[in-house]
Design a protein with these regions (language model features):
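Glycine-rich, acidic/polar active-site loops that bind/position phosphate-bearing ligands
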Residues: 1-172
Length: 172
């Protein structure tokens, strides 16, 4: 996994037998077609999996399991890609640390749950009409949030709390 210059998640699947080669050499791809990356004459790029980010995906219950790793993006000579958002963040964090700053972050994920089967071209319908902090036990929103929290915690991501937000179908 990696993101383009606009933050869109990108991915490539690799067979387990090819993983050692990906660690050693990277996975080649055409950077000129990734939004915010290279010009056509700088197209050759490599995605190098970072083993420290290895994580089994709990929602993919099949056997064998599925895992993900984030990748560092490099040029063929091994130099980091200046367009790699991960590298940009690492450089910024290093500069901040050199100045005595520490970086803290905490995501707040909000989303809407919509009914299935909406007719294309029509306005999507929220799954409920609940409001801020409304308690709807055994409702679809409540059950979805519980399942999502379970998967996040299975990946080692702690969740402080969840609740219904102010708009119909809106959750945090």
């Amino acid at each position: 996994w990696f993101t383009d210059g606009l933050g869109t998640l990108k991915s490539v699947a690799i067979a387990p037998a090819e993983l050692e080669g990906a660690f050693a050499e990277g996975i080649g791809f055409d950077g000129s077609v990734i939004e915010g990356f290279a010009r056509i004459y700088e197209a050759d790029m490599l995605a190098k999996p970072d083993p420290s980010t290895f994580q089994v995906l709990p929602w993919r219950g099949e056997s064998p399991g599925t895992a993900r790793m984030f990748c560092d993006l490099t040029l063929p000579d091994g130099a980091p890609s200046m367009a790699d958002p991960r590298h940009v963040l690492q450089r910024a964090l290093t500069k901040a640390a050199d100045l005595g700053f520490t970086f803290y972050t905490h995501p707040e994920i909000e989303f809407f749950l919509l009914k299935q089967g909406s007719v294309p071209g029509t306005r999507p319908e929220p799954i409920d009409q609940a409001g801020y902090f409304d308690h709807v036990p055994h409702g679809n929103s409540h059950d979805f949030r519980r399942a999502a929290i379970g998967m996040l915690e299975a990946m080692g991501i702690s969740v402080e709390f969840s609740h219904h937000e102010g708009a119909p179908g809106q959750n945090e």
